[in-house]
């Protein structure tokens, strides 16, 4: 490294001196070397007055809380070339302890013993008079506390009224420090609290405090986002309203026609029809209905049942869409097929998915889907004796298809063949030694024929 680079560089300090001189000149026009015209003016006086009308409150905490409104003032009449320090302290405004009752502050007893006197020194202190006069003096960093923690915070008693005071002190030079003047403003009085008591004060703090506005914006934003989200979800899921709150037209209207007579031991016709109509209306609102659950039939009366398709053995709920309306005059019947493996095949003929033939005579009924009959019949176990509900049944082969008035009924309503819903299943009249459900006659017990006949 050469000797030229080792030498200290030559600085031009003229621009630094000019900057200091201009800084001193900026506040000189407001100065007064005699300090006789010293004046301190409160900034934001109108805002302070709005809080004062409602009895202003300031929060005090253990760690300290900043003031709002911020205490700031403009100073004029200082000696621009003299050094000054500006301090802030708080003096009790009265001799009362206050309490908030029925929406207003009222005196609540004698005051507590005053805390140790403390003062807040402005961070720019000490400084030239020109510096203090060039712009307003703000005490934005002062913190109010209810604990004496020795960190330079101002300690105040809660529920006591205070008034801030600004002190201007001249420092430096051969002269000793001396107090020039103190200034106080009645608009800045407040009651120290640990939590805001007056809701109006809280609203003013939120409205005018820039830091509280951020909290208010977050709150309003959250509410708007919730409303927007709620509005956006409504068109995406229009079925929710009718799914949870169906319209009055889908809530179980009274039906004079019953699907199941009480004699079959089925559930209440009204409740069942309500359930069918209700779930039918609800399923119509789904974009993808639930798949129909399989129906497990524990007892199969005939071997022909085992050969039916799976769709014909579904539960009642998904099958209701294929039901024929009540009151239809169409008669359904099929050729009687007696299964050799079933003893009473003639009485309960098998139901298959094949096409049915029109009936010849013996009763009028209402056609119902095959799954309805099977679901109704599956509730009854196959009897081991030759009687059902007290009525004997003929042995196998004793019932022929030539029985006048016999049909292959496909529904419980057809089995009744016009009987009253309160009659028993076994109360059918007979033709010879055979049951004829379509004929309504007097009670006549049946006796099975002798083996030799």
Curated annotation (Swiss-Prot):
Q: Which Pfam families match?
A: T-box
- DNA-binding region residues: the ranges are 47-217
Instruction: State the superkingdom.
Output: Eukaryota
An MF annotation (GO) of this entry: DNA-binding transcription factor activity, RNA polymerase II-specific
Subcellular location per the Swiss-Prot or TrEMBL entry: Nucleus
Any transmembrane segments, and where? none
Do you know which PROSITE patterns this protein is assigned to? TBOX_1, TBOX_2, TBOX_3
Predominant localisation class = nucleus
Alphabetic keyword roster: Developmental protein, DNA-binding, Nucleus, Transcription, Transcription regulation
Q: Does the record bear Amino-acid biosynthesis in its keywords?
A: no
Q: What job does this protein perform?
A: May be involved in the transcriptional regulation of genes required for gastrulation.
Which protein are we looking at?
T-box transcription factor T homolog
């Amino acid at each position: 490294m050469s000797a030229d680079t080792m030498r200290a560089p030559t600085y031009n300090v003229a621009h630094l001196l000019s900057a200091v001189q201009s800084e001193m000149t900026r506040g000189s026009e407001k100065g007064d070397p005699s300090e006789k015209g010293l004046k301190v003016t409160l900034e934001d006086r109108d805002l302070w007055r709005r809080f004062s009308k409602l009895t202003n409150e300031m929060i005090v905490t253990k760690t300290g809380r900043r003031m709002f409104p911020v205490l700031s003032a403009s100073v004029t009449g200082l000696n621009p070339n003299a050094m000054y320090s500006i301090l802030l302290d708080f003096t009790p405004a009265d001799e009362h302890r206050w309490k908030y009752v029925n929406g207003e502050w009222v005196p609540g007893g004698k005051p507590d013993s005053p805390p140790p006197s403390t003062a807040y020194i402005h961070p720019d202190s000490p400084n030239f008079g020109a510096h203090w006069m060039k712009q307003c003096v703000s005490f934005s960093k002062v913190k109010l506390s209810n604990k004496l923690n020795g960190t330079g915070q101002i300690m105040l008693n809660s529920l006591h009224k205070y008034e801030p005071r600004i002190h201007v002190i001249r420092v430096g030079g051969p002269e000793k420090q001396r107090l020039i003047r103190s200034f106080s403003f009645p608009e800045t009085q407040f009651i120290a609290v640990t939590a805001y008591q007056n809701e109006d004060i809280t609203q003013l703090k939120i409205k005018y405090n820039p830091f509280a506005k951020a909290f208010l914006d977050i709150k309003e934003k959250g509410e708007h986002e919730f409303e927007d989200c709620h509005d956006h979800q409504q068109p995406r899921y229009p079925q929710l309203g009718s799914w949870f709150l169906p319209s009055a037209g889908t809530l179980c209207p009274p039906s004079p026609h019953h699907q199941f007579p009480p004699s079959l031991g089925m559930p209440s016709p009204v409740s069942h029809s309500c359930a069918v109509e209700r779930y039918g209306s609800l399923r119509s609102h789904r974009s993808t209905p639930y798949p129909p659950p399989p129906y497990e039939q524990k007892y199969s009366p005939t071997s022909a049942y085992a050969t039916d398709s799976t769709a014909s053995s579904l539960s009642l709920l998904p099958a209701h869409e294929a039901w024929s309306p009540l009151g239809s005059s169409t008669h359904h019947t099929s050729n009687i097929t007696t299964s050799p493996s079933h003893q009473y095949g003639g009485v309960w003929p098998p139901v298959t998915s094949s096409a049915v033939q029109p009936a010849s005579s013996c009763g009028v009924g209402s056609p119902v889907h095959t799954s309805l009959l099977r679901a109704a019949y599956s509730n009854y176990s196959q009897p081991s004796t030759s009687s059902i509900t007290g009525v004997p049944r003929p042995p196998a082969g004793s019932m022929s298809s030539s029985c006048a008035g016999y049909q292959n009924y496909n529904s419980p309503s057809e089995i009744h063949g016009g009987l009253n819903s309160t009659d028993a299943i076994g109360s059918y009249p007979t033709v010879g030694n055979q049951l004829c459900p379509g004929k309504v006659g007097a009670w006549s017990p049946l006796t099975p024929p002798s083996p030799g006949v």
